[in-house]
Amino acid sequence: MLKAVIDAETLRDAIEAVSSLVDEVKFTITEKGLELKAVDPANVAMVSLKIDASAFEFYQATPGEIGVDLVRLSDLLSMADRGERVRLELLEDERKLRIGVGSLSYTLSLIDPSAIRKEPRIPELDLPAHVAIPGAEFRRAIKAAEKVSDHVVLGVKDDIFYMEAKGDIDALKLTMRSSELLDMKPGEARSLFSLDYLSDMSKSIGKAPEVKLEIGIDYPLRISFMLKDNVHVSYLLAPRIEQE
């Protein structure tokens, strides 16, 4: 059972953070909120999303699972104006999700959860370097890096966080000392990542006041942030191998 009311923009932002990587997901419904974990088809990136019950204006649920087509859900949510509320009601017998926006009511057919790719096991990584920066600053750096290359290096040396992108002709480098960051745990780190993935992720990251980056040497990058109203998002992105 699920009955809930939530701000349309809050739900749209949460869904966008996931739909940049996958089209279909299995939501786990709990009394504490909605959760999901998913991996992209190429097994390069993972995403974890948790929408706390406190993010909803009204939330009543019993434990269960539902499979959702995020493309269709996003399309329906695009009908809601800023400031509008979205009403959600699970029709268990019909295996549908009723979505209400203003005077409109839609029914979204659900997917059998067993038909959706199994949730990934998110590895527990003890990455040495932690950096916290404004989401908008990270988004701007990623957009700038895209202009010169299709990959970017993220690293930490001493008290400096840096991002480097090199193309055939042009190059870009961002450096920020610990005093310019929101927070920092120094540690030797340097890894190369695909800008295709980071660009998709950064659309949601740019809306967060603060984003935490956890980096190692040729290790996956963990990106954690919170969108408004208690929506928790975490990405894990596999590194690329640097060519000598």
From Swiss-Prot:
Protein name, UniProt field: DNA polymerase sliding clamp
Annotated function: Sliding clamp subunit that acts as a moving platform for DNA processing. Responsible for tethering the catalytic subunit of DNA polymerase and other proteins to DNA during high-speed replication.
Organism: Methanothrix thermoacetophila (strain DSM 6194 / JCM 14653 / NBRC 101360 / PT) (Methanosaeta thermophila)
Xref: InterPro entries: DNA_clamp_sf, Pr_cel_nuc_antig, Pr_cel_nuc_antig_C, Pr_cel_nuc_antig_CS, Pr_cel_nuc_antig_N
Assembly with partners or alone: Homotrimer. The subunits circularize to form a toroid; DNA passes through its center. Replication factor C (RFC) is required to load the toroid on the DNA.
GO BP terms in the entry: leading strand elongation; regulation of DNA replication
MF GO annotations: DNA binding; DNA polymerase processivity factor activity
Classification via PROSITE patterns: PCNA_1 (PS01251)
Pfam family membership, one: PCNA_C
Keywords: DNA replication, DNA-binding
UniProt-listed SUPFAM superfamilies: DNA clamp
Family the entry assigns: Belongs to the PCNA family.
Top-level lineage group: Archaea
Native organism taxonomy: Archaea, Methanobacteriati, Methanobacteriota, Stenosarchaea group, Methanomicrobia
